[in-house]
Amino acid sequence: MKLSFNTWPYSCFPIWVPSYPLEEAIKRIAKIGYDGIEIGAAAPHAYPKYLNPARRKEIKQILDDNGIALSSMLPAPGGGPGFNPSSPLAEERAEMLDQYQQVIELCAQWGGKTVIYLAGWQVYGTSRKQAWEWSREGLVKVAKMAADHGVTMVVEPQAVDTNLIEGCDDAIQMMEEVGAPNVKLMFDTIHVMYRNEVPSDYVYQMGKNLHHVHISDTDRLPPGQGRGDFISVVNALKEVDFEGYLTMEIGFHRRDIEPDKVAREAYAYMKPLVG
């Protein structure tokens, strides 16, 4: 089990929190002690179209020089430059495929092996069945792209942000319907708690298909500062022999945060638990 930190609180997403260049975020996160870094493929850090070949090589060298691995990547969220895999617009779904292709290639270039699949949301006037089918069809195609680069796609249930894949059963159903060996599962503790469910239950339900985990206490606080039971989560992960990354996705819930502080606090709390 390894610890990773997501770059959102260093990137001005989704609100105008302090913004730092990607290389600065990498150095700070590595200095704290994290094994990995999860990079959002969005401006200002890593929107693929904004990164020329020289810049890509530069970031890979910075990762190597600081002894930190790319644990995972995820695309720009919906809205703005983002996209909806379940969109009724064929053009938007096509853009989703192009964007995922670019994110997968970038992830592989930087030594990463995991990309998060955000299934999208049902738009008014579209049936849930149709929205689901569009998202499923998209993931089938994306999984083939990822397989060519040795990348695993992980389906994330997002109760706070979507109305399509909200819980554990939804994610498992999507994975099973796609049926690709490189499509696995993940969960974020804040989404589980939003549904008034128990995060450690997700560990047991996902079992051997659990590939990645996001750690966040209530209100995107560092673990140990809200109501989350992370001792039980880690104990459950040990029981199922989880060997992936626990990524802190925290600290972007308000403007006046200090990203180094929340990163240190999360590491100090989680490191003794994982050993």
Residue ranges with predicted function:
Residues 1-112, 140, 147, 180, ...:
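N-terminal pre-domain/capping segments
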Residues 9-11, 41-43, 76-79, 119-123, ...:
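Active-site-proximal loop/turn and secondary-structure-junction residues that shape catalytic pockets
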Residues 36, 130-132, 136-235:
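Acidic/histidine-rich catalytic cores of soluble enzymes
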Residues 86-91, 121-131, 157-163:
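Surface-exposed cleft-lining segments at the edges of enzyme active sites
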Residues 107-127, 149-158:
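Active-site groove signature of glycoside hydrolases
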Residues 222-223, 245, 254-258:
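Short active-site-adjacent structural elements
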Residues 230-246:
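Short glycine/proline-rich, acidic loop/turn segments that cap or connect secondary-structure elements
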